[in-house]
Amino acid sequence: MLSTLSALYGHLAESGVIPANPAALNRSRLGLGARDASPTIRLTAAQVAALLTAAARPTVRGRYARLHATRSVAYVALLTLGLRVSEITGLDRGDRYRTGGDDVLRVLGKGGLHREVYVTELVREALSDYLAERDRLAGTANPVRRGRSGTGASPLLATRAGARCSRIDLYTQLRRIAADAGPALDGVAERVHPHALRHAYVTIALEHDAPIQHVRADVGHATIATTQHYDRGLRRRSASAADVVAKALDLYKS
């Protein structure tokens, strides 16, 4: 129980929601020796695929069963793009559009900087299924046009009542999915959190020989800000690792 709370508070502290992790152990006060910080869990492509499979399993019955399942799949699918959870919760329906013949998401990253993230077929199908079910049940506000925002914007991921999902909502949802993922996540399910999938995006991409500069551009690391300034107009789908990661995950989909 303590490890679960510590992981939750650790994620909130990392995201800037709270100043520090109140569940972290004070090792010196307890007379324990110093140790290296526990690294982010390293998920394999097979484990990420298991999360996608588990997300599709209905967890509620009745009218909203398909809505919950499709939203869970859409959420995990978005995480396979290497997005931060804060970037996912900030997405509006109008942030999804086509450019140069490709589906993209306009993501607001750290420092208030936007970047375009290429949408894989996995993510496109997951979002289409979820949004179609959401619209069928209750309808939503019309998507805002590209570059526009305001109080009328419709969140890409929403609660059943139509409100924007919070980071805690999605964190809790991912923990539930991980717990249902079966043997593939044995021993690590309690340590799965959104940043672990962002980390997995980077490691899977690099393991499959994606150019590191493409990976850094995909995830919005600050260290490539200068490169992006000069390369923004030339960036194409071929300069993204998204399809590399999607192909790796496809090998393990059931």
Label every model-predicted segment.
Residues 1-254:
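Conserved catalytic core of the tyrosine transesterase superfamily
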